[in-house]
Regions:
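N-terminal lobe/hinge region of extracytoplasmic solute-binding protein
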Residues: 1-43, 74, 137-138
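Extracellular/periplasmic solute-recognition and catalytic clefts
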Residues: 91-93, 145-154, 172-229, 236-240, ...
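Detector for C-terminal structural segments
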Residues: 148, 244-275
C-alpha cells in the first residue's frame, strides 16, 4: 500500500524520492531545511513557527502553501495512532506561507519529529480517503508511475520539482526481501543500486572501481531485552551479564565496525549528549565476578563461567 499513515509505508514513499518533509536530516544526522526554509520557537516554548518555502509545487502543479501543509498534518493526526507519540498539537494555524504549531507542553525536538517520514506532505485536495496502489501527490523529485505491491515500483521525473531537474528520467525499484539475494543481484548487474545489505557483503564490493559504497550513521539503536523471569529474575545476575559483555568487541568483530557500543536508548547521531553519558554497566569482567560472588554464585568447575 502507498498509504503514508499506515504502518511505516511513508518510509517507502520517501525512499522512492516521492515524498518530502518540512525538514530532514543530512548525512551527518544534523537537521536541515527542506520544504520549510526556517523555523523558530516562541519564548514560552509552546509554539513553533515554520516558514514554508516559496515557489514549491506539488507534482500536479498545485502550490505548496502553509494551508496545504496544515491539511496534510491534520490528515496524518486523524489517521495515524503513531502521530501523537511524537507530539500532540493543540492547534495548527496557517497564515500565508507561515505555519504555527502549538502544543500544551514544550516539545524541544518538535522540528526533529517532523523529519520522520510519517509527516511527509501530501496534497489533500484530491480527497482520497485511502491510498492503496494509487499514489499520494507529493513534492519530491519523482512521482509514482506504477506500483505492484511486493514486486516493484516505477517512478518518473517530477517536472514540477522545486529543487532542479532530477538526474534520472525513470527509476524501477524491485522488491528483493533477502539481503544476500540483493547482494547477488547487484554483483551480477541485474540491479544498479542496493541498500541495507549485510555487513558481511561489504567485502564483496570493496576495491571495485565500478562500485560506489556509501555509509551513513544510523539514527537507530538496537536494544536486547533480558528475560526478567526464571534464572534471570535475579537483578545481580542480569547486571553481571551486562558487565561481562564486551560490546566494543561485538561491534568490531561481529559487525565489522559498523556499529557503536550503546549506553543509552538514543544513538550518538542525535544531539543529546551521548558522549558525556557514563555507561554504568560497561565491560568489566572483574566487576561481574565480584557481583556474582556477592550474590552467592560460584564457579564450581573453574571454567570461568
Amino acid at each position: 500500500t502507498l498509504e503514508p499513515t499506515e504502518q511505516y509505508f511513508s518510509w517507502v514513499i520517501t525512499r522512492y524520492g516521492v515524498g518530502e518533509n518540512l525538514v530532514r536530516f543530512d548525512e551527518n544526522g544534523q537537521l536541515e531545511p527542506s520544504l520549510a526554509e526556517e523555523w523558530k520557537v516562541s519564548d514560552d516554548k509552546l509554539t513553533w513557527e515554520f516558514k514554508i518555502r516559496d515557489g514549491v509545487k506539488f507534482s500536479n502543479g498545485n502550490p505548496l502553501t502553509a494551508e496545504a501543509v496544515k491539511s496534510s498534518f491534520e490528515r496524518t493526526f486523524k489517521k495515524s495512532k503513531r502521530a501523537e507519540g511524537f507530539f500532540k498539537p493543540t492547534s495548527i494555524v496557517a497564515d500565508g506561507q507561515t505555519l504555527k504549531i502549538t502544543t500544551e507542553k514544550p516539545v524541544a525536538i518538535l522540528p526533529q519529529c517532523l523529519a520522520d517520514p510519517l509527516f511527509l506532505i501530501i496534497d489533500t485536495s484530491d480527497n482520497v480517503e485511502e491510498y492503496t496502489t494509487n499514489a499520494p501527490i507529493c513534492t519530491g523529485p519523482y512521482v509514482f508511475k506504477e506500483f505492484v505491491p511486493t514486486e516493484y515500483a516505477i517512478v518518473e521525473r517530477n517536472e514540477n520539482y522545486w529543487g532542479g531537474k532530477p538526474g534520472l528520467a525513470k527509476v524501477t525499484f524491485k522488491c528483493i526481501n533477502d539481503q544476500s539475494t540483493r547482494a547477488l543481484s547487484l554483483k551480477s548487474g541485474e540491479i544498479g543500486v542496493a541498500y541495507n545489505l549485510k555487513i558481511e557483503n561489504k567485502a564483496d564490493f570493496e576495491g571495485q572501481d565500478d562500485i560506489n559504497i556509501q555509509e551513513l550513521k544510523s539514527l537507530r539503536s538496537t536494544y536486547a531485552f533480558m528475560n526478567q523471569h526464571g534464572v534471570l529474575k535475579d537483578i545481580a545476575l542480569r547486571q553481571a551479564l551486562l558487565r561481562a559483555l564486551n560490546k566494543k568487541a561485538y561491534c568490531e568483530d561481529l559487525l565489522g565496525g559498523a556499529a557503536t557500543p550503546g549506553k543509552a536508548p538514543i544513538p550518538p547521531t542525535l544531539d543529546f549528549g551521548f558522549d558525556k553519558l557514563v555507561d554504568e554497566n560497561a565491560y568489566n569482567p572483574e566487576s561481574a565476578k565480584e557481583i556474582l560472588a556477592k550474590a552467592g554464585y560460584k564457579d564450581v568447575d573453574g571454567d570461568g563461567f
